[in-house]
């Protein structure tokens, strides 16, 4: 679903994917949790990891949840291969660099935190007394929760998402009408980007829940895909349509993702990121380049859309262009020229049908 979220988010998703309910690793962790033995598991057997291992014994056997459960009864750590297919060592003592800072309490969790920061590997600490599973990697710390708790939160987030998508639909419908009338203001654009990013942040939360739930999340995943199928793509295309020409739209998108919730509320702050400083949002009119609308026309390749925007600069000019003018653009023949003209006409008609211009 989410393709371009920030790297830290993606790292956490990767971790949750391999530990979702139903995976062999999660089954092993749950067995240890139920037995209340506690445990420390390191994923990865690189030289860097083996250099801080002292003692224990070599297993080098195929991974299975029952093997891990039995080995966790011993005090030492378990070392798994990076692909979690083999158990490399057991009952190992780990000697991380004591100068690596940690705010964890308890020997097991302090060791796990330090190793994760020192090596960048995934380290799992299973608490004997608190009965929780904590995952560490680099500076990430995440506590796995019971599926019933996550399912409740996921359903609640889904209800919130439905409300946000409803508001976003109205904002986008309004923007569509204004784009075809060439009456878009910076306020309209920044509101659309703000609302889209708000939706994407809830989607990311939902994706995290889905990763944690594993095969228990099929229904929620289907509902999520139905709700927000093209939302992230729309946000990127909005930025391409309206950011200043000298700016890299991917960097702009990264900056918007990095905004805090408080900053995201401020439309002037979003406007500044897109290259507009010290201008009144409501009174400043701006024309779209046309990326978003052209991408909505079926069977028009991305490279052709690039050529159209490069030639005509604005959506208004594309709409006013004749078949002959479109035909001259590289990659556009008579058939594509008709497809673009007819496609834009249909989109304009649809926008007028859907219009729900928000009174400001």
From Swiss-Prot:
Classification via InterPro entries: DisA, DisA_sf, DNA_integrity_DisA_N_sf, DNA_integrity_scan_DisA_link, DNA_integrity_scan_DisA_N, DNA_integrity_scanning_protein, HhH_motif, RuvA_2-like
A single BP term in Gene Ontology: DNA repair
Keyword annotations: ATP-binding, DNA damage, DNA repair, DNA-binding, Magnesium, Nucleotide-binding, Nucleotidyltransferase, Transferase
Domain DAC: 9-147
Residues at which ATP binds: 76, 94, 107-111
Reactions this protein catalyses: 2 ATP = 3',3'-c-di-AMP + 2 diphosphate
Keyword hit for Oxidoreductase: no
SUPFAM superfamilies: RuvA domain 2-like, YojJ-like
EC number from the UniProt entry: 2.7.7.85
Molecular function terms from GO: adenylate cyclase activity; ATP binding; catalytic activity, acting on DNA; diadenylate cyclase activity; DNA binding; hydrolase activity
Record Pfam families: DAC, DisA-linker, HHH
Cofactor requirements of the protein: Mg(2+)
Role, per record: Participates in a DNA-damage check-point that is active prior to asymmetric division when DNA is damaged. DisA forms globular foci that rapidly scan along the chromosomes during sporulation, searching for lesions. When a lesion is present, DisA pauses at the lesion site. This triggers a cellular response that culminates in a temporary block in sporulation initiation.
PANTHER family, sorted: DIADENYLATE CYCLASE, DNA INTEGRITY SCANNING PROTEIN DISA
Family per record: Belongs to the DisA family.
Complexes and interactors: Homooctamer.
Official protein name in the record: DNA integrity scanning protein DisA
Origin species: Clostridium tetani (strain Massachusetts / E88)
Gene from which the chain derives: disA
């Amino acid at each position: 679903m989410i393709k371009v979220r920030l790297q830290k988010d993606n790292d956490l998703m990767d971790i949750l994917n391999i530990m979702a309910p139903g995976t062999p690793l999660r089954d092993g962790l749950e067995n240890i949790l139920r037995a209340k033995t506690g445990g420390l598991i390191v994923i990865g057997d690189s030289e860097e990891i083996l250099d801080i291992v002292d003692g224990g014994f070599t297993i080098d056997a195929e991974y299975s949840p029952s093997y891990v459960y039995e080995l966790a009864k011993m005090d030492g750590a378990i070392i798994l291969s990076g692909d979690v297919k083999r158990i490399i060592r057991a009952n190992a003592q780990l000697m991380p660099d004591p100068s690596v800072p940690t705010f964890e309490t308890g020997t097991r969790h302090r060791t796990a935190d330090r190793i994760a920061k020192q090596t960048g590997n995934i380290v799992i600490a299973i608490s004997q007394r608190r009965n929780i599973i904590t995952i560490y990697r680099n500076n990430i710390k995440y506590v796995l929760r019971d599926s019933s708790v996550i399912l409740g939160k996921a359903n609640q987030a889904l209800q919130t998402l439905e409300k946000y998508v409803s508001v976003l639909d109205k904002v986008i419908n309004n923007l569509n009408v204004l784009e075809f009338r060439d009456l878009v203001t910076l306020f309209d654009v920044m509101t659309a980007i703000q609302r889209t990013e708000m939706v994407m942040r809830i989607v990311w939360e939902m994706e995290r829940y889905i990763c944690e739930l594993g095969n228990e999340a099929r229904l929620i995943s289907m509902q999520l895909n139905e709700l927000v199928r093209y939302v992230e793509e729309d946000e990127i295309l909005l930025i391409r349509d309206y950011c200043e020409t000298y700016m890299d739209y991917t960097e702009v998108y990264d900056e918007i993702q990095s905004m805090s919730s408080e900053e995201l509320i401020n439309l002037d702050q979003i406007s500044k990121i897109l290259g507009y400083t010290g201008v009144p949002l409501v009174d400043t009119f701006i024309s779209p380049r046309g990326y978003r609308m052209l991408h909505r026309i079926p069977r028009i390749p991305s490279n052709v859309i690039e050529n159209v925007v490069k030639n005509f600069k604005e959506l208004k000019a594309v709409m006013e262009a004749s078949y002959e003018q479109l035909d001259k653009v590289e990659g556009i023949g008579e058939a594509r020229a008709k497809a673009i003209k007819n496609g834009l006409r249909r989109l304009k008609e649809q926008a007028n049908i859907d219009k729900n211009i928000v009174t400001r």
